[in-house]
């Protein structure tokens, strides 16, 4: 039996009477033909009732009351018999039947009920894992994935608790990824997909083609991502060199290419952006221009606006200034425009690649920072000693 302390109570009558009333209510719909009493065994009785819940949203004005009543009965089914009941419930209380966005929708009501059930089965890991999968899918329909605790650390803790096999982890990660994309949380979705690819090794990397393609696609179209070289190190992405050379070439383009390279690629593959990356080309044009600006910033910290306009294929007027402001706002670079000299002064920038050279540079800068802090500390100490000596 589930932990009923984790769930609210929805009815104050005995179980047999509640089952009979549910059957009577559900039989109001023409397509439902339940026996008025049903099987004497509660689990079988509940399975029959749950099998009719797919039509509930199409006619009932009391979806929340019915689902809450049923969930209060599910949790009293003995542990060894509850799994098929839960299976029937989540099969019929699914996104294809419970539609809408937000808490007030049918999907939102289902999210609430599934959340309560999830909490009630903390001691039944197999059942809880099934409910969680259903909950993620329903959150995607209701656009409520932001309300579900599903960051990577939490997911890994759950996988460890449930002892979820690798393929099961991949299935859940894919579902979370889809839900995040639906809710336009592209940056989080990209991280989840990268974690998914991390479950593949060189032995099964070839089987990860679809996941690898989606990982590259999600990362490239994410407006907040500017560094992609870490994807190259994933076995599943490496396998794209042979399984999907064009997608791998696109990844390399966004790792180190420029606007010129991008235009040449699109000219040779005119349908790739819309059919494979599935994104409006204006989004990618802005992205590759930002990446090109970052590459220019790596080469020199003072760039003439005329050169910048030429490299980015933007008129050297207010349009260019607006682009630079956008680049600063998304943290691609930091700097300012010198109107008199007509130059862009770059004070810092994001690295497109972060390899050995960048780590060495970071180490040098940290050493300088530490040395400066030590010197400052010594100076303050000397000043304090002089004050005390007065």
Curated annotation (Swiss-Prot):
GO terms for biological process: cell cycle switching; cytoplasmic translational initiation; formation of cytoplasmic translation initiation complex; oogenesis; protein deneddylation; regulation of oogenesis. It is found in: Cytoplasm. It comes from the Eukaryota. Pfam families: PCI. Its main location: cytoplasm. GO terms for molecular function: translation initiation factor activity. The keyword Ribosomal protein does not apply. Residues 188-351 form the PCI domain. The keyword Lipoprotein does not apply. Keywords: Cytoplasm, Developmental protein, Differentiation, Initiation factor, Oogenesis, Protein biosynthesis, Signalosome. SMART domains: PINT. One of its GO terms (cellular component) is eukaryotic 43S preinitiation complex. Component of the eukaryotic translation initiation factor 3 (eIF-3) complex. Within the eIF-3 complex, interacts directly with eif-3.F. Component of the CSN complex, composed of csn-1, csn-2, csn-3, csn-4, csn-5, csn-6 and csn-7. Within the CSN complex, interacts directly with csn-1 and csn-4. Component of the eukaryotic translation initiation factor 3 (eIF-3) complex, which is involved in protein synthesis of a specialized repertoire of mRNAs and, together with other initiation factors, stimulates binding of mRNA and methionyl-tRNAi to the 40S ribosome. The eIF-3 complex specifically targets and initiates translation of a subset of mRNAs involved in cell proliferation (Potential). Component of the COP9 signalosome complex (CSN), a complex involved in various cellular and developmental processes. Belongs to the eIF-3 subunit M family. This is COP9/Signalosome and eIF3 complex-shared subunit 1. The lineage of its organism: Eukaryota, Metazoa, Ecdysozoa, Nematoda, Chromadorea. The gene is cif-1.
């Amino acid at each position: 039996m589930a932990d009923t302390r984790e769930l609210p109570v929805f009815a104050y009558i005995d179980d047999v009477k509640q089952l009979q009333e549910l059957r009577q209510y559900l039989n109001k719909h023409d397509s439902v033909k339940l026996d008025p009493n049903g099987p004497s065994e509660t689990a079988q009785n509940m399975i029959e009732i749950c099998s009719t819940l797919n039509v509930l949203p199409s006619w009932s004005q009391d979806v929340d009351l019915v689902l809450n009543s049923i969930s209060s009965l599910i949790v009293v089914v003995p542990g060894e018999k509850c799994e098929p009941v839960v299976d029937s419930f989540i099969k019929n209380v699914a996104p294809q039947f419970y539609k809408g966005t937000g808490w007030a929708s049918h999907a939102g009501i289902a999210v609430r009920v599934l959340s309560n059930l999830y909490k009630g089965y903390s001691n039944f890991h197999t059942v809880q894992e099934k409910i969680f999968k259903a909950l993620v899918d329903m959150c995607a329909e209701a656009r409520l994935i932001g309300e579900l605790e599903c960051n990577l650390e939490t997911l890994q803790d759950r996988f460890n608790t449930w002892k979820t096999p690798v393929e099961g982890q991949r299935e859940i990660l894919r579902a979370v990824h889809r839900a995040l994309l639906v809710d336009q949380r592209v940056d989080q979705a990209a991280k989840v997909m990268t974690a998914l690819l991390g479950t593949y090794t060189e032995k099964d990397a070839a089987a990860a083609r679809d996941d690898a393609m989606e990982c590259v696609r999600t990362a490239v179209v994410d407006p907040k991502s500017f560094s992609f070289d870490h994807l190259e190190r994933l076995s599943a992405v490496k396998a794209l060199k042979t399984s999907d050379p064009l997608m791998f070439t696109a990844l390399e383009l966004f790792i180190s290419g420029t606007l010129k390279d991008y235009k040449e690629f699109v000219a040779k593959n005119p349908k790739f952006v819309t059919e494979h990356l599935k994104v409006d080309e204006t989004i990618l044009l802005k992205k590759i221009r930002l990446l090109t600006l970052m590459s220019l910033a790596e080469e020199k910290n003072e760039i003439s606006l005329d050169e910048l306009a030429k490299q980015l294929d933007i008129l050297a007027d207010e349009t260019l200034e607006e682009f630079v402001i956008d680049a600063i706002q998304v943290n691609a670079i930091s700097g300012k425009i010198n109107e008199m000299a007509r130059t862009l002064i770059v004070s810092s920038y994001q690295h497109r690649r972060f390899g050995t050279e960048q780590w060495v540079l970071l180490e040098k800068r940290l050493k300088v920072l530490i040395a400066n802090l030590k010197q400052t500390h010594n100076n303050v100490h000397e000043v304090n000693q002089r004050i005390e000596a007065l």
